[in-house]
Amino acid sequence: MHKLVAGVAGFVLAVLMLAGCAGDDGTTGVTVEAKEMRFTPKSATLGAGRQVVTVHNAGHLRHTFSINSLGEEVTVNPGQTKTLAVELAPGTYRYVCRVLDHEGLGMRGTLHVN
């Protein structure tokens, strides 16, 4: 009986978490972690339309999250989390950290939009 209750509770929790992925206005998004000289994930796939990118700086240095082709950028200090709402057409978008040579040291990634 306890296994059944635990299984049902786990299923309900999973459904609630998935329901929380879309905003009231139809937005969806991705969370990117910035840490010394890397972004995680290095790439993500999203649907076209309004997307929210949440950037969390888990490192000890200041970073930026820049989508140059859209002219969008946020600066994220250590321990901070910031969001960036963008309208994405199908295509590929590169994101980078523009602090010093962080991009050259590996802080870059790609958003694939279907």
Where do the model's predicted regions map?
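Extracellular/periplasmic metallocenter environments
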Residues: 15, 24, 76-114
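Sec-dependent bacterial lipoprotein signal peptides
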Residues: 1-20
